[in-house]
Amino acid sequence: MAEITAKMVSDLRVATGLGMMECKKALVEAEGDFAKAEEILRIKSGSKASKMAGRLAAEGIIGSYVEGGVGALVEVNCETDFVAKDPTFIALANAAAKAVAIANPADVEALAAVEVDGQQVEEIRKAAIAKLGENMTIRRFVRYQTEGAISTYLHGAKIGVIVDFTGPEQVGKDVAMHVAASKPICVSKDQVSAETLDQERKIYSAQAAESGKPADIVAKMVEGRINKFLAEVTLLGQPFVKNPDVTVEKLLAEQKASVKAFAMFVVGEGIEKKVVDYAAEVAAAAKL
């Protein structure tokens, strides 16, 4: 068997991102064969990922990537906020975003097979799991390709926004930040679904009917509230966050700009997190 040197262990650690002891054990098992040791670690990484697959991953970050007229946002989840800040996990999110942008995969399953800088996204994910010891999942992504421009905004990596727009670069940045702050549901009022409008109309009609006013007045009250609702939830109707005296629609008109589409991800949005009652756990332990 070839001698296992410190340099071999160090080189394997650099290649895999795993710990020194794991790398040394793999080299011993492979009898000093570097390629075989690397393969052993990849297999073990996959096994570790499978064992952790059922564990809830509700923390994480948003990764982004923009190249010319193509941009992508990706939500990647882990189990704790501590791991979400680790460079290895951040690298996974960035690699996933780049893969989405360059390959335009159909879904998360297809994304796993995309190769970035010589490695499949799934291999990068499994290596990160093996190194950091937490379950990690790529939850969702969005990709825009446009003849206009793409702007992204990340707020603490917990909120991510991507905007497909035309106009000055600063306008794109400002609109992306505005979306993160004001959270519109769509660009314009014609994009609000009929189902949403019907639901709001029912609520406002019931509220207005309680006023006891004539039917024609009630109808006007309902329409007024619907118009206010549309202004509150649409990007164009909202007061611009950096200058509330103007709407986003007016800002865009002044800058000869337009917004075709936007998307926003919030980490963990819609994932039911387990609430741990530590006081109850301590009390239960004390009774043992």
Curated annotation (Swiss-Prot):
Q: Which domain of life is it from?
A: Bacteria
Q: Which InterPro entries match?
A: EF-Ts_dimer_sf, Transl_elong_EFTs/EF1B, Transl_elong_EFTs/EF1B_dimer, Transl_elong_Ts_CS, UBA-like_sf
Note one Pfam family from the annotation. EF_TS
Which stretches of sequence are listed as region Involved in Mg(2+) ion dislocation from EF-Tu?
Answer: 80-83
Keywords from UniProt, A to Z, are:
Cytoplasm, Elongation factor, Protein biosynthesis
Protein biosynthesis listed as a keyword: yes
MF terms in GO: translation elongation factor activity
Subcellular location per UniProt equals: Cytoplasm
Question: What are the GO cellular component annotations?
Answer: cytoplasm
Q: Does the keyword Protein biosynthesis apply?
A: yes
Q: Which HAMAP family match?
A: EF_Ts (MF_00050)
Tell me, in a sentence or two, what this protein's role is: Associates with the EF-Tu.GDP complex and induces the exchange of GDP to GTP. It remains bound to the aminoacyl-tRNA.EF-Tu.GTP complex up to the GTP hydrolysis stage on the ribosome.
Tell me which family the UniProt entry assigns to this protein. Belongs to the EF-Ts family.
Name of the featured protein: Elongation factor Ts
Taxonomic source organism: Chromobacterium violaceum (strain ATCC 12472 / DSM 30191 / JCM 1249 / CCUG 213 / NBRC 12614 / NCIMB 9131 / NCTC 9757 / MK)
Corresponding gene?
tsf
